[in-house]
Design a protein with these regions (language model features):
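Short-chain dehydrogenase/reductase
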Residues: 2-88, 101-102, 112
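Short SAM/SAH-binding signature in class I
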Residues: 92-93
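Helix N-cap/beta-alpha junction loops of NAD(P)-dependent oxidoreductase domains
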Residues: 99-105, 153-156
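A short, exposed helix-loop element centered on a Lys and neighboring polar residues
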Residues: 129-130
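Catalytic loop of short-chain dehydrogenase/reductase
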Residues: 137, 145-157
């Protein structure tokens, strides 16, 4: 694997979990990491914020940029992408990591929850790709990585 030294990653949902792990791995190579997530304020039920993630990225050897961003909102995505480009000069890799999951069956899924999953998992990933693509096309080796929420490990079809 080649180094991510000097590359810029725009990672959604990077304040915790898999997104944070990807950010820290990239930081160890010296990458610039834009942490785009809704978690600007600490939540006692969920670890991490965009600010703690940016600090961890810096401690790991990269440059971190904390961006409060709800990826369902086009204006917020566009502003976060613009801030990333203004700060780091471009975007090399988009990691669509943010997701909404609901590990219940169809009959137990309220439409409000279904709509949230579609808005985050589909619309949000599309919005981020659409906003990042003009900048990715200027990068020498651009990538878009889209992760999916984990499927139930005990399916009942």
């Amino acid at each position: 694997m080649s180094s991510l030294q000097g590359k810029t990653l725009f990672i959604t949902g990077a304040s915790r979990g898999i997104g944070l792990a990807i950010a820290l791995r990239a930081a160890r190579d010296g990458a610039n990491v834009a942490i785009a997530a809704k978690s600007a304020v600490a939540n006692p039920k969920l670890p991490g914020t965009i600010h703690t993630a940016a600090e961890a990225v810096k401690a790991a050897g990269g440059q971190g940029l904390a961006l409060k961003c709800d990826i369902r909102e086009e204006d917020q995505v566009n502003a976060a992408v613009a801030a990333t480009v203004d700060t780091f000069g471009g975007i090399d890799i988009l990691v669509n990591n943010a997701s909404a999951i609901w590990l219940r069956g169809t009959l137990d899924t309220p439409m409000k929850r279904f709509d949230l999953m579609q808005q985050v998992n589909s619309r949000g990933s599309f919005l981020c790709a659409q906003a990042c693509l003009p900048h990715l096309l200027q990068a020498p080796n651009p990538h878009i990585l889209t992760l999916a929420p984990p499927p139930s490990l005990d399916p009942k079809w």
